[in-house]
A protein has these predicted regions:
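Acidic/histidine-rich catalytic neighborhood
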Residues: 194
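Beta-rich carbohydrate-recognition and catalytic domains
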Residues: 1-131, 135-185, 197-244, 254
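Repeated scaffold domains used in trafficking and secretory/extracellular systems
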Residues: 247-249
Length: 254
């Protein structure tokens, strides 16, 4: 299965099927074994069993992402072109996008209008947001971003919800969903969200961050998407797997 040749690798994300080949990306330090100098690593496969490690898809070479190209998502846009959506780590945490320069998806070019989201929405004290997940409902593209709410007696995880007509211009809507750690044990901040319709229901997966001895864990709820909010069937989530070793799930339709 997928295995990097060397150095730091974590958080696989952005699973994509294009022209008969699967692509997946990851946080990668190409020159050292520690978490730092983060770019987007890239693997490709014809069958999801045999993987080739490609050159990094994105590197931090602009002011708005100078502190790292952090996790995000990949989609096929309305023109049938793959598009990367990533967390741009600059002086503030924002969102950047990129487009391929070749059909093999080896070379990528950042959008000239980056960052498409410059920073977190007004009214929230936490400054970090990360890990986009993007999907389409009808004619509207939606994006959620992992976040946390600090300005309460009980800090908790949350998901910022944005929408767009073209995957370039994004408007903040509200919080898609908030946790309640006293009830659901979902922690103070959520990473690597996935929001996927399966059958007639939606599955929301989040990764709570480790905090005060509580380990990271991938949890999920099943529910509905109504009035641009997630409504869980049960306020208490389930654990995605038993031994707590899966922390950045990705999904793709084939």
């Amino acid at each position: 299965h997928l295995l990097p040749a060397a150095n730091w690798t974590n958080e696989t994300h952005g699973l994509l099927l294009y022209k008969g080949k699967y692509h997946i990306f990851n946080q990668k330090n190409a020159s050292a074994i520690f978490l730092g100098q983060i770019n987007w690593g890239h693997f490709s496969s014809p069958d999801m069993l045999h993987w080739t490690e490609e050159k990094p898809a994105l590197t931090p070479d602009a002011a708005y992402d100078k502190n790292g190209i952090w996790s995000g998502h990949a989609v096929i846009n309305d023109d049938g072109i793959p598009q990367l959506i990533y967390t741009a780590g600059g002086d503030k945490m924002g969102v950047g996008i990129a487009f391929p320069k070749d059909t093999a998806l080896i070379e990528w070019e950042k959008y000239a209008g980056n960052p498409v989201i410059a920073e977190k929405p007004a009214g929230y004290t936490r400054t970090d947001m990360r890990d986009q997940y993007v999907w389409k409902e009808g004619d509207v593209w939606y994006m959620i971003i992992g976040f946390g709410i600090e300005q309460t007696d009980t800090p908790h995880g949350a998901l910022l919800l944005y929408k767009s007509a073209d995957l370039k211009r994004w408007d903040f809507v509200h919080l898609l969903f908030e946790g309640n750690p006293e009830v659901d044990d979902s922690g103070i901040f959520w990473e690597m969200p996935v929001f996927k319709k399966m059958g007639g229901k939606y599955v929301l997966l989040v990764n709570r961050v480790p905090h005060k001895g509580i380990p990271a864990r991938c949890q999920y709820w099943i529910g509905d998407f109504k009035n641009e909010k997630f409504i869980p069937d049960n306020p208490v989530p389930q654990n995605l797997e038993v031994i707590n070793r899966l922390l950045s799930p990705s999904v793709v339709e084939t």
